[in-house]
Curated annotation (Swiss-Prot):
PROSITE patterns: LEM_LIKE (PS50955). Belongs to the thymopoietin family. InterPro entries: LEM-like_dom (IPR013146), LEM/LEM-like_dom_sf (IPR011015), LEM_domain (IPR051656). It comes from Bos taurus. Residues 4-47 form the LEM-like domain. Keywords: Hormone. Hormone of the spleen with pleiotropic actions on prothymocytes, mature T-cells, the nicotinic acetylcholine receptor, and pituitary corticotrophs. SMART domains: Thymopoietin. The gene is SP. One of its GO terms (molecular function) is DNA binding. This is Splenin. It comes from the Eukaryota.
Length: 49
């Protein structure tokens, strides 16, 4: 899969689905998009390096 350096271009729903697809546990409740962007960077973008 192609992990983005700048995940903020994705929609919040897309971010959430990408995280779930990669077995990342999402925080409870509805979060701001930045929260998911941060998780994406920590878990997915980091894997690519």
């Amino acid at each position: 899969p192609e992990f983005l350096e700048d995940p903020s271009v994705l929609t919040k729903e897309k971010l959430k689905s990408e995280l779930v697809a990669n077995n990342v546990t999402l925080p409870a409740g509805e979060q701001r998009k930045e929260v998911y962007v941060e998780l994406y960077l920590q878990h997915l973008t980091a894997l690519k390096r």
